[in-house]
Each structure stands twice: as C-alpha cells, then as structure tokens.
C-alpha cells in the first residue's frame, strides 16, 4: 500500500517540476479549471479511461499522464472530456492555440484509481493526491473548483507571474495518508523506542548502588555515655652494639605523647591503670634482656 502511494506521489512531483520548468499562462489555467469544473458538475458524462496493464493485488492501477497543449493543431487536449466525439487518446477542448506554447510540456492531468476501480482525475500537485485507506466503493476523490469538503487542496486565483496560488491545509488522517505520512509515523515510533531505551540505561543497577551515609549532626554530642577506658601502650627498644642485642619492653600510658624516640612516660590524666593486663603476665617488662646471637631472639 505504501509503495503504491509513494509511486503516485513521485508521479505528481514530476508534474510539478514540469510546471515549474515551463509555467503556463494564467488564462489557460483558468479555462482548464473551468472545463474541469463542468466535468465535476456532470457526473453522468463519459468517464475518462486510459490504456494500462491489469492492476496488481493491491487494486490500484498505474497512473496515466496526459499533457495539455502538447501536440496536434496547437490546441490543448485533455482526457475524459467531450459530449460524444472522442478518440482513444485525447479530446480537443477548443482552446485558442495562442494561450499555450506548442513546445511546452504543459499542465498535466493526473489519474488515480481507487479501490473500486473508478478513475479519479485532477489537475493538482502531489500533496493533494490521497488514496483512501478503506475499501468502500463509494469513497472517491474529486478535484478542481468543486472539491469535496474532505479535500486538502484549494486552488486560488493565479498571480501576476502565471503561477497558481495554492493553499494547502492539513490533510485529515482519518480519511487517508500519504507515503510521507507513513515514513513519519515509522520514524516517530523509532524515536520513541530509542528514548525509552536511553531512559532504561540511566536506572541504577541492583547491587552496585553506592549508599553514602548522611553527614553527622553537629547538634549531637561527640562523646559517648561510656568514657574510653585508659590503658597502656607497649613500647619496645632494640639496641645492638655489634656483639649483642639488647631488648627493653615497657608500657607507656595512653595519655602520653607519641614521639620518634623511645621514652618512658608517666600518666598525666590520672585515669590510666598503674599496671595493665599485658604487663602483669609479661615477665620481661622493665627487665633488660640481651641475646648473644640473633637466632636466639624469640618471634
């Protein structure tokens, strides 16, 4: 379905390019639109046909392009008009040859066949060519001055340069869609999917979340209810004079200052115990022990 619509749009764009390359006079456009209005007002007239291959499974036929003012006698021709006399290809409208240039590719008539097989004709640009999404046989497209209220193209008065002023309104989505609309809808779904995936990557993974503890409250007291028990800090001094190794062990109070050298400090706070538990069981405390050989030092 989308491929058929894209093909119709492409053919319509070719018509627009031909008009821009060699624009037609405003008088010729007005007469062509008047003739088209007469056909639209009389649906009982003979309907236009074109030679084409059989339609595919989609039910849409290939468009037939017929140039106005392109050949014989200098008179512009358009398909599907006339009150009885017509050949297989074209029918003369009787416009004066001076209105259109003989070498111009001219205004092109674009034909679209709906699902019911009826031809829909219009002198309009590609944006106004829409294929109905339903299979209703009565739903046909019209063009020209007497377009239906569902049409999205209104051809206004021609300007001084000979171009037709076209006011394009938004096409109702419920009635049909163009190939560009299909592409836009697919692109929107892709962008939405990418947006959801990017949001999912921002979620923190379970088991790898870093929980930072809150900062401490300065109003709370820093001291605990139970005071820290004072104790002793074990000090060891090794002296080697080249012959023997002297080892001294003792405990300094916890309130004493730690220095680089070895000192025997005293308690200044009055809360440290006189003798710690380790000093009570260690027989080498406050006793200098010397060893003649290094392997004799216990580990």
UniProtKB/Swiss-Prot annotation:
Residues 40-98, 134-174, 204-230 are annotated as: Disordered. Residues 134-145 have a biased composition (Low complexity). InterPro entries: Paramyx_V_Zn-bd (IPR024279), Paramyxo_P/V_N (IPR028243). Residues 146-160 have a biased composition (Acidic residues). Keywords: Host cytoplasm, Host-virus interaction, Inhibition of host innate immune response by virus, Inhibition of host interferon signaling pathway by virus, Inhibition of host IRF7 by virus, Inhibition of host MDA5 by virus, Inhibition of host RLR pathway by virus, Inhibition of host STAT2 by virus, Interferon antiviral system evasion, Metal-binding, Viral immunoevasion, Zinc. Coiled coil: none annotated. The record marks 240, 246, 248, 250 as: Interaction with host STAT2. Zn(2+) 2 binds at residues 255, 267, 269, 272. The N-terminus interacts with host JAK1 and STAT1. The C-terminus interacts with host STAT2. The C-terminus also interacts with host PP1. Belongs to the paramyxoviruses V protein family. Plays an essential role in the inhibition of host immune response. Prevents the establishment of cellular antiviral state by blocking interferon-alpha/beta (IFN-alpha/beta) production and signaling pathway. Interacts with host IFIH1/MDA5 and DHX58/LGP2 to inhibit the transduction pathway involved in the activation of IFN-beta promoter, thus protecting the virus against cell antiviral state. Blocks the type I interferon signaling pathway by interacting with host TYK2 and thereby inhibiting downstream STAT1 and STAT2 phosphorylation. This is Non-structural protein V. The gene is P/V.
